[in-house]
Amino acid sequence: MGRYYPVHLKSRCYVCAKCKTHLAFKGHLLSHDYRGKNGPACLFKRVENVIEMEPKTEQMSTGRFIVRHIHCCRCHTYIGWKYVSSYEPSQKFKDGHYILEMQDAVLQRDDPEPDDCFIHPPITFLSSSFS
């Protein structure tokens, strides 16, 4: 599936709670005020090291969206979704951004160890083999 490239991060980051793979820099956090399927969630403008599944339409509390579920590229744990497109004009600001579930999928680290954080190129699967 590719080679792991460890990166030493000097700033705060969010990592997969299961395997500690780096997912997002704190600086890419847009908002804490979201709810995921499993509890509290955060909106990010960019994430790393994820597998994007097929796009599908979902009805959420703020309207209908085309989304791609995202999984950690290392352990394949479900961690959230990407907003591909909104049907509601008032929700278009979410397009292209990501929701990370905070309850079980990710946790915040102050000083990650170099071997704990990995950067992978984005991976997009056309079939949902992890659902």
From Swiss-Prot:
* Residues at which Zn(2+) binds: 16, 19, 72, 75
Which InterPro entries does this UniProt record tie to the protein?
Yippee, Yippee/Mis18/Cereblon, Yippee_fam
Q: Which GO terms describe its cellular component?
A: nucleus; ubiquitin ligase complex
Does the record carry Metal-binding as a key word? yes
For this UniProt record, the keywords arranged alphabetically read as follows: Metal-binding, Zinc
Q: Which Pfam families match?
A: Yippee-Mis18
Where would I find the Yippee domain in this sequence?
Answer: 12-109
- GO MF assignments: zinc ion binding
UniProt record similarity statement = Belongs to the yippee family.
Q: Which PANTHER family match?
A: PROTEIN YIPPEE-LIKE CG15309-RELATED (PTHR13848)
The name this protein carries in UniProt is Protein yippee-like PJ691.02
Give the species this sequence originates from: Schizosaccharomyces pombe (strain 972 / ATCC 24843) (Fission yeast)
